[in-house]
Structure formats: C-alpha cells, structure tokens
Amino acid sequence: MKLNNLVFDFDKFAFEMANLKEKKHFDYLVTIVGEDFGGEEGLGCIYILENTKTNERTSVKMLAKRVGENDFVIPTVTGIWKVADLLEREVFDFVGIKFLGHPDM
C-alpha cells in the first residue's frame, strides 16, 4: 500500500493535523515512527493516519526542529489523538525527539 507523504511547516503542523482529523475524518492515529532521515533533514517522524469509515490511510512526514545543540522538537498531537500520548513517549525514548506541549514530557 503506497501512502501519501504529506509535509507541513513546523508552525502549522498541529493546525494541519487537526484539519486532517476534523475535515478529512482521519480519526485514528495508527502509529508514529521516529526516524533519522540523515543529511540535512535530520530527525523526524512519520505519522500514519486512518479514516476508519473508508479505510483510507495517509502519512505525514514531519521534520523535527533543532533547538540548541542536541535537542529536537515537534509539536504534540496528544490533544488531537489520545493514543499519541504513548506513541510520542516511545519516540522520545528511542529517538530522542521531544514533543512540545506533551502532558508528560
């Protein structure tokens, strides 16, 4: 299955993800995969979303913003999908990306 790889600006990420849920009905966050894309891209995540009524899936690629020397951050989506709480903490543990606004980070 080939998925779209949507990419959003850092500052609009949370807004665009909320639009995917509310307007496009991607009501289920399947997973978040933390990754080192290498080179200039650096660390980031792939989000897999599903519309459970149509079974349509899409993916979103979000590059982490470097803060300081060794910190990488992405805005949290815990306010949009509750399951993001655990998925984001797992990415933090394995890859080191911090999620801005996460309730337990």
Protein language model features and the residues they cover:
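Terminal low-complexity/charged segments
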Residues: 1-105
